[in-house]
C-alpha cells in the first residue's frame, strides 16, 4: 500500500474568518492609511507564503526523489514573485479605493427621504437635531464641528463620556418641538434631522441651509445613513472602519449561531410593558441577529404597537427583554400577577438591555453590541457572557476614546 502523505489542510472558510477578524484589529490599531496599508501588505504576503510552503512541504512524501528539490525551489521562487505581485496589486487597489472615497465638492447626495441635497463645500459647522446621527458624528471624529444639538443632550451619558462640550451647545429642540429659528440662527453648513421633520427641512432649505433627512430604521438603513453622512462630511475612511467592525460582529454572530434553534423573545418598549416592536422595526432585526425570534412577528405596525396581557400570554415568550430606557424594572415584570403563567416569568428569564453608555436598542452604530449582549443571554454556550463586555470596551475605546476599567 502507498503511504498517505502527511498533509496540513487549511480550510478556506477558517482562513477567510482569520483574515476578517485580524483586519478589524488592524483597523483599531492602525488608523493612518499608510500604516494600515503596509501592515496589510506584509500580513497578506506572509500568509500566502506560509500557506504555499505548508502545502508543498507538508504534502510531500518521504519517498520523494532528491531530484525534485530544484523544482521545489523554482516553485517557491515563482510563489514569492506571485506574492510580490499580489501585494503590489492590493496596494494599488487600496490607494484607488482611498482616492475614490474622498468627496469632491460640490457634491449632490440623495438623503433617506429621497431628496437631492447639494453641498458646495466640505461642512465646517454642523447641527444635529437627532441623537442617532449625533452619536455617529462623534464616532466619525466630527464633534468639534458641531454647533447645535438636539434637546436634553445633558441626559445622554455618551456625550458626557466622549464629548462633554456638546452638552453646552445650543439646543434646537426635539422632533415634536423643533426650534426652526434657533437652528437657522446658527448658520450651519449642514443640518441633519430625522425623517419626520420634513417640513422643517423644507423651510431651512428655502433659507439656503442644506439639510439631510435620515431614517435608520433597519440594519440596511443604518448602514445607508452612515455612508450618507460620511460622504457629506468627507469622513469615509473613518466610516469604513466603523462599518468593518459592525460587519465583523454580524459575521461572528451569524457563523456561531447558524445551527441554533431560535428562542422566542418579547421586546418591551420604554413607556410600557405592553408596548412592543413588530418586524418592521430595527429592534426586530436586532433580535434575529442574536439568534432569537420576535414573539410579535405578526404585528403589522411600523412603530411601537400596544397589545394586551392576553396577547402576551398567548405568545408565551421564553424571554422578555426590556428596552434600555424603560420606565419600569425587571422586578416589576417578575412580580406582575398578570404574567405569573408566562414562561419567561416562571423561569426568571427577564432582562433589560444595557443603556449605561447609550440606548443600544436604538439604531445607533453601537446597536450591534445589543445583539452581542442578547446572544449571550439566549445562547450562552455559543456566545460567552464576557463577549459583550470585551466587544463593548473595544468599540467605545476605538471609536469614542472611552476606556472602561470595569
Residue ranges and their predicted role:
Residues 276-304, 308:
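Alpha-helical, coiled-coil/dimerization segments enriched in small aliphatic residues
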Residues 99, 106-109, 115-118, 199-275, ...:
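Extracytoplasmic substrate-binding proteins
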Residues 8-9, 14-23, 28-32:
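Short, positively charged and aromatic/hydrophobic N-terminal segments
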Residues 128-186, 190-196, 295:
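A short, structured surface patch at a secondary-structure boundary
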Residues 37-47:
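Bacterial N-terminal signal peptides that target proteins for export
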Residues 48, 52-56:
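Hydrophobic core
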Residues 58-68:
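Bacterial lipoprotein signal-peptidase II cleavage site
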Residues 172-175, 180-193, 209, 308-325:
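Proline-aspartate-enriched helix->loop->beta-strand connector
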